[in-house]
Amino acid sequence: MSNERYNARESEPKWQAKWDEAKIFATRNDDLRKKYYVLEMFPYPSGRIHMGHVRNYTMGDVVARTMRARGYNVLHPMGWDAFGLPAENAAIERKVAPKAWTYDNIAAMKKQLQTMGLSLDWAREFATCDPSYYKHQQKMFLDFLKVGLVEREKRKLNWDPVDMTVLANEQVIDGRGWRSGAVVELREMNQWVFKITKYAQELLDALDTLDRWPDKVRLMQRNWIGRSEGLMVRFALDSATTPAGETELKIFTTRPDTLFGAKFMAIAADHPLAQAAAAKAPKVAAFIDDCKKRGTAQAEIDTAEKQGIDTGIRAVHPFDPSWKLPVYVANFVLMEYGTGAIFGCPAHDQRDLDFVNKYQLGNTPVVCPEGQDPASFVITDTAYDGEGRMINSRFLDGKTIAEAKEEVAKRLETEQLAGAPVGARKVNFRLRDWGISRQRYWGCPIPIIHCPTCDVVPVPDADLPVVLPEDVSFDKPGNALDHHPTWKHVTCPKCGGKAVRETDTMDTFVDSSWYFARFTDPWNTEAPTTPDVVNRMMPVDQYIGGVEHAILHLLYSRFFTRAMKAAGHIDIQHDEPFAGLFTQGMVVHETYRKADGHFASPAEISITVEGDTRRATLLDGGSPVEIGPIEKMSKSKRNTVDPDDIIGTYGADTARWFMLSDSPPDRDVIWSEEGVKGASRFVQRLWRMVNDAAPIAASAPAERPASFGADALTLRKAAHGALDKVLSGIERLAFNVSLAHIREFSNTLGDALARSQTPSPDLAWAIRESTVILVQLFHPMMPHLAEECWTVLGQTGLVSEALWPPIEQDLLVEDSITLPVQVNGKKRGDVTVPRDAPTSEIEAAVLALDTVKQALGGKPVRKVIVVPQRIVNVVG
């Protein structure tokens, strides 16, 4: 075998330059071949790529290169999700302008990505902070406004009085701002919102069409949209206990069957009835103030101790005027969900049970499990939320839950309160409209002008884009656009009077909700999309990214294609942006902790192995280091590996191969130095193998032989079998399976080369064919090595432009077949026979099996039934 080593440092830049010079990855919009659009979620320009990027973009590149080889017009673009808070933080901490920081990072990361050998169409590159991009985003905002998909409304928001900005629920920790530590206030503020709820049912129903999405992602979206069928119930308020002007309390419930188990009503701290109660009760007012200081994240509310205060108000049970229910203000009820009010049935809801146990309100079970004695069925610390029959429920007793729900609905639909039905069937959604206003500088400006005479005025299309000013200061807290001395002061386009710009910018999720459509024609200066192009190139056939984006980004993108359709910018099948979605696992690594408790990086560690024991020591000084758990690579744990170091040491192809080979792509991959070294050894083995095969390939006859001997036929069957299996694995995104088949076939070819010092013409031809196939098989994963091998084999052009070899189906048919064997109905073994063996030969082979003889126990064989190509049954 050849001893020549493959030099990745020389090879990889050379081939990257050749690809770039030939522009082989540029996609033509007028190409009439069938399109294939593969896209990885574009990165935020933090300044450095990490190994997660390497894994993500390698997967997409394998798909892109394979589909290009299969004759598709492949669109595989790259851009930058470039707006966001980190750029402003950099401006504050490092005294560098957000724009400069962002574009410097883009340049650095682009250079890193280019060393990976990705088959990207860089001509389509853009950053979402480019005015040429957000001009069209502003245009779509105005178009959405025209068709009723944008509104301005007042919302209660988390306000950080130190940073002077609105915080997301998740940014409020123990009632304080995550960054400033200030006590957060709930403020009612104007917000621009996208009316995503108009599409709630459509977004839910269309999940059933996304059969190439992971089930877990569809389930997460289904739960987020949260469709529930229930009853809107109007509870009359006892006038003797209620503030003037308040007459009823509306609640939405999915469990009207449990009304006879009600023990209390609960309302949100900002419910109008709570405000009315607070005006007359200082203790209620104090409790409400305390609620406003608590975190508003759903997870925090779910885990916090359930607390409330009795307002003194009483609600009247809809089926019994004498039954009065206390109305509490509770810290677990949110105004944003339902009506901001609930009735509590503690026996069948754990949250309600915790509440009544705290305040000693008692509970009455109204659903009894089948087989339980209703007289002895009690609830203490654990609520029962299963099926059963109604008890303690008057006219509902004995009914199933479904029957009881229907009966309650029918009765309340006919009952009247103030001239209207007490109950009405209603479909409710957990999904809320998308508030996009952010009090930040580094985001897409909202194209609105506020005029004291004309009120809200859209910026005229001719004045787009509204460009961010660059001469901003971050010396003061809050939004730098608010502080700018000139930028916000404008003339009203309607009346010509003095006016001010909207200083809120758009949520950065808006930027990433349509970028995939812009990639289809980023050169269009007049409109966000070119309809005939976007309608032909969309949807994205394969989208790849992290499961952390399963809800917001993916749901907002699904909304955006529908909104863009309503505004005339796109019209695609099912209105879905991503036909196929794949969520890859993370890259994880051991953690290492020094004696002082601080983490050490892998680069600082030496690992020794003694038997089954692994020990870690510091390279500097040799001090022992504790080997900790395997965790996601992160800067805080210092368990990251720099892609530049790996690519610089081993080459991009080695990094790409390792990232694909270690584990199924939807699972986490454990970073291992030994695994990387193993991938590097395989690269060298392939290089030597191709160099060994090259002289034989050169001596092979140009014409295909009329027939093939046994050795040549065996090799050709292995080659075409590998073609079929590797392609199948890539189509299923089972990259590790494809790589295993490549390894297996390389072993077969290596064995053939070792036995073929002077091969016959037919075997030489088969070796040449098989070696060329091997190179094409590993080309999507290791493209630089493949190009070098392609040249060694004397092939013309670039392997990156070569078509996938045709698979000869007759070579996929196995000469033998393995059939299960049953004796008297029980499986006793298998038999392998020639595929075309006659029945008599199969019978003889079966009866010769020791397991069959043992099963018969000396009894005579009555008959042998051979089901061709399926099974053999022996009856004794």
Curated annotation (Swiss-Prot):
Keywords: Aminoacyl-tRNA synthetase, ATP-binding, Cytoplasm, Ligase, Nucleotide-binding, Protein biosynthesis. A motif ('HIGH' region) lies at residues 43-53. Its main location: cytoplasm. It is found in: Cytoplasm. GO terms for molecular function: aminoacyl-tRNA deacylase activity; ATP binding; leucine-tRNA ligase activity. GO terms for cellular component: cytosol. CDD domains: Anticodon_Ia_Leu_BEm, LeuRS_core. It catalyses: tRNA(Leu) + L-leucine + ATP = L-leucyl-tRNA(Leu) + AMP + diphosphate. One of its GO terms (biological process) is leucyl-tRNA aminoacylation. Its EC number is 6.1.1.4. ATP binds at residue 635. Belongs to the class-I aminoacyl-tRNA synthetase family. HAMAP family: Leu_tRNA_synth_B (MF_00049_B). This is Leucine--tRNA ligase. It comes from Rhodopseudomonas palustris (strain ATCC BAA-98 / CGA009).
